[in-house]
Amino acid sequence: MLSSTLLCQNPLQEFDTTLERLFTFASWADKFDGAVHQAPIRANTIALNEPVGVMGVICPDLAPLASFITLIAAALCQGNRLIVIPSENFPLPAVDMYQIFETSDVPGASINIVTGKHDELITTLSEHNSVDGIWNFGDSKYETEIDRASVSNLKQIWTINGNKVNWISSVSY
């Protein structure tokens, strides 16, 4: 039996938070352009923000809808393509989002959702040479495996280092 602490205690609050995050990250999508810096020797230096590329996103079990939407919206607004492993115990919010993605203006194949056991999927995702970065918000027990499997192609890795995230907090992202 799954612990009730994995589920959001207030589903309505989770849904409202999810909608707020979608609007927040949608507004950020056009605000990450580059800048021109004046160099001290009468020259210009151009700074461009570029997407990572193909990112693997591993979602936690806590607040499955809010965490899924927050993670994909943040990565997608930067121009990345995503391979998302949703919550292992509660994948239905992510799976239901398939229908919304298909009928929305989200470019095809920019969000790919793969459900299954995290033990099996994380190693495959980490070893894949076409994945440029891994964003792990899943269980911290996978951090060592992600590090080991990602060495061959030097992909970028971001993890929460065992910390817990309050996905429903009103902290501005």
PLM feature spans:
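Substrate-binding/gating loop at the entrance of the active-site cleft, primarily
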Residues: 37-95
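Conserved nucleotide-cofactor-binding alpha/beta core module
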Residues: 88, 95-112
